[in-house]
Amino acid sequence: MNIVAIISQKGGAGKTTLALNLAIASELAGFPSAIFDLDPQASSMGWKDSRVDESPAVVSLHSARISHYLETARQGGAKLVIFDTAPHSQKDALEAAQVADIILI
């Protein structure tokens, strides 16, 4: 399973848009994906709630639960996990960066 963290301290930089598009492209290519929404604004969750399709999976969580949800995603067959981080939360961004294979800034 590959893990990507999208990090920027600026709001409105396109982190959520990039996360959603990467996850959709992964799904269309046949690789199940999940988005972990670490932003309290929960824009990825809002997008998910407006959709009928169940994939890609989107989970809103706090950084303290990252390990648990990574294992759940792994057991569920996810090939790609994307962290959509908040612009103001250094702690959550750092936690995501520490477990990521790729960090997009």
Segments from the language model and where they lie:
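P-loop NTP-binding core
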Residues: 1-105
